[in-house]
From Swiss-Prot:
GO terms classed as biological process: ribosomal small subunit assembly; translation
UniProt GO MF annotations: rRNA binding; structural constituent of ribosome
Stored NCBIfam families: rpsS_bact
Protein name according to UniProt: Small ribosomal subunit protein uS19
The organism of origin for this protein: Thermosipho melanesiensis (strain DSM 12029 / CIP 104789 / BI429)
Disulfide bonds: none
Family, similarity comment: Belongs to the universal ribosomal protein uS19 family.
Pfam families in UniProt: Ribosomal_S19
Coiled-coil spans in chain: none
Keywords: Ribonucleoprotein, Ribosomal protein, RNA-binding, rRNA-binding
GO (cellular component) term, any one: cytoplasm
Chain's role: Protein S19 forms a complex with S13 that binds strongly to the 16S ribosomal RNA.
Amino acid sequence: MGRSTKKGPFVDPKLLKKIKQLNEAGEKKIIKTWSRASMIVPEMVGHTIAVYNGLKHIPVYITENMVGHRLGEFSFTRRFGGHADKSASKGQVKK
């Protein structure tokens, strides 16, 4: 179930403040954030936000299509190392 429309989308207040300051100044800097739950709002379009994935900050360039999604959706927290190679399991004998 989604968030109440009465409350509006969640955006970290500090992140929104930084975005508004950059928009007023007309600058495009990379902004580091740990707030993966923040919703992407139209004010963020055109900015690059470095979203923390638990290991490092992943730079995410915000486009029009991303509005309404959360920042954490674009910074994956799990790495897929790949499946085991078939040749490695062929030589083993089951007991």
